Amino acid sequence: MKSMLVHIVLVIFIIAEFSTAETDHDKNRRGANMGLYAFPRVGRSDPSLANSLRDGLEAGVLDGIYGDASQEDYNEADFQKKASGLVAFPRVGRGDAELRKWAHLLALQQVLDKRTGPSASSGLWFGPRLGKRSVDAKSFADISKGQKELN
C-alpha cells in the first residue's frame, strides 16, 4: 500500500515537472484578449454636443477652420498610409454648421436662465430650520419664566 502511494506521488511529481503547460505568472494581465487597447483616438467629436458657452464658442471657431467637410472630401488611401498603427473611430453625430449654431444659442440661453445659469444653486436649503420646533409650548413657557428682562 505504501509503495503504491509512493508511486502515485512520484508519477504526479514527474508529470508536473515535465509538463509543457504555461507557467509564466509574470505575464501582463492586460493582454489583447481583455479588450483594452492602448492607442490614440483618431477623429474629432461632435461640437454640437457642447454643454457650456465656452464649449459652444470653441465649436464655432472649429467650424470656421474645418467648414462643412463630408466623407467624400477625404482620400482613404492617404489615411491608410499615414495612420497604419491608429484605430479610427467613427465621427458620431457630425452635424452641419446650423446645428452647431443652435447649440451655441442654447448655451447662451442657459447662461441667461436663472435656474440653469452660472449662479444656479443645487436646490438644497442651508438656512435655519423652518417649521415645527422640537421644543413644545409648555416647556418653552417654563424656560421663559426663569429669564429676567434687561432694561
Curated annotation (Swiss-Prot):
One of its GO terms (molecular function) is diuretic hormone activity. InterPro entries: Periviscerokinin. It is found in: Secreted. The modification Valine amide is found at V42, V92. GO terms for biological process: epithelial fluid transport; monoatomic cation transport; neuropeptide signaling pathway; nitric oxide-cGMP-mediated signaling; positive regulation of cytosolic calcium ion concentration. Keywords: Amidation, Cleavage on pair of basic residues, Neuropeptide, Secreted, Signal. It comes from the Eukaryota. In larvae, the precursor peptide is exclusively present in a single pair of neuroendocrine cells in the labial neuromere (subesophageal ganglion) and three pairs of cells in the ventral ganglion abdominal neuromeres. GO terms for cellular component: extracellular region; extracellular space. Residues 1-21 form the signal peptide. It holds the Pfam family Periviscerokin. Residues 22-28, 45-80, 95-113, 134-151 form a propeptide. The modification Leucine amide is found at L130. CAP-1 and CAP-2, but not CAP-3 are ligands for the Capa receptor. CAP-1 and CAP-2 are probably components of the signal transduction pathway that leads to Malpighian tubule fluid secretion via the second messenger nitric oxide. CAP-3 is a ligand for the PK1-R G-protein coupled receptor. Belongs to the pyrokinin family. This is Cardio acceleratory peptide 2b. The gene is Capa.
